[in-house]
């Protein structure tokens, strides 16, 4: 069924806006996946703030012009779903990687971050990135450790002085 020109322009504008705000994109071939499974995937994507787009390849190629995701142009072949991560760069990668494990027909084609197209084998690289919350927690732990050590050292100084004074006192008492 043909799409009207106005509808095509709206689709291109929507995908362009999404691509402009996204941190990463993952491309996958969705052939053989049922509509029920796709609906479940979309629900999970909404929860993770990942935007899924299924558009014609020609419209997608036009939509990504002028964005950092122009590099995905060669991968736009055959039925393709685009998963844009809006807050966490690894969210779309984790989501589609888990979905691909469940559904053998679902095949990841590639991913792009920072204007670089990577193959599907690189999905783990992006999927294992910590979330913002996890990264901040690790940073807090790493920065807290030296401060805690310093506090313990400073708290230990009066105790050491007391022990030295007591030892000197004991020596003088033994000598007397």
Curated annotation (Swiss-Prot):
**The entry's keywords:** Ribonucleoprotein, Ribosomal protein, RNA-binding, rRNA-binding
List, alphabetically, the GO terms of the cellular component aspect: ribonucleoprotein complex; ribosome
Q: Which domain of life is it from?
A: Bacteria
Entry keyword Ribosomal protein? yes
Any one GO MF term held by the record is: large ribosomal subunit rRNA binding
GO biological process assignments = translation
What is its quaternary makeup? Part of the ribosomal stalk of the 50S ribosomal subunit. The N-terminus interacts with L11 and the large rRNA to form the base of the stalk. The C-terminus forms an elongated spine to which L12 dimers bind in a sequential fashion forming a multimeric L10(L12)X complex.
Q: Which family does it belong to?
A: Belongs to the universal ribosomal protein uL10 family.
Q: Which HAMAP family match?
A: Ribosomal_uL10 (MF_00362)
Task: Explain the purpose of this protein.
Answer: Forms part of the ribosomal stalk, playing a central role in the interaction of the ribosome with GTP-bound translation factors.
Name-wise, this protein is Large ribosomal subunit protein uL10
Native species = Marinobacter nauticus (strain ATCC 700491 / DSM 11845 / VT8)
* Lineage per the UniProt record: Bacteria, Pseudomonadati, Pseudomonadota, Gammaproteobacteria, Pseudomonadales
